[in-house]
Amino acid sequence: MDSNDKKGLKSPEIIIINGSPRINKNCSFIANEVKAMLEECGLSCKIFNIYNMDIEYCTACGFCEKTGYCKFNDDMKPLYKMFDDSKGTIVISPVHFDSISAKLKTVVDRTQAIYASKYVLNKPSIDRSKKRIGMYIAVGGVNHMIHSLKVDRL
C-alpha cells in the first residue's frame, strides 16, 4: 500500500482495481487509460495493483459476522475506508478460466466484512445512503482491442 494512504490523506474519488498478475499488459494499459480519462474530467483516481498488495485469503472464520470488520490487518483494511469515501469503484480483470483472477476473487471474498456489517449485524460499515458507481471491465488477450481503445481515445 502506498505510504500516503497510511498517513490518512484524502481517499480518491474513483478507485481502480487492477486484478491482473501481469505487469504492464492489457489490464494495466486499460487501467491507466481509464484513470487518464477520468482525471481529464476532474476526478481524483488511484489504481490499486492487487498483485502487489498484501491481501490475506478469507478463511470464513466468522469474525466479521461478530464484529463487522475483518480480523486481518493487511492492505485490504484501507480499501474498506476508500470504498466508503469514494464515488465509485472500477474493477478490471483478465478472464481466467471464464472467471476473474484468483487474487481478485480474494478481494471479493474479503468484502464479506461489508456484507456482514449490514446484513448480519444491521450496522453497515459503509454509508448506504451515498450513491456510488461501479464498473467491471473483463479483458481478453486480443491485441487489436487495445489498438481500438487507443484510436477511440484520440
Across the structure, where does each feature detected by a protein language model lie?
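Short, glycine-/small-residue-rich phosphate/pyrophosphate-handling segment
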Residues: 118-154
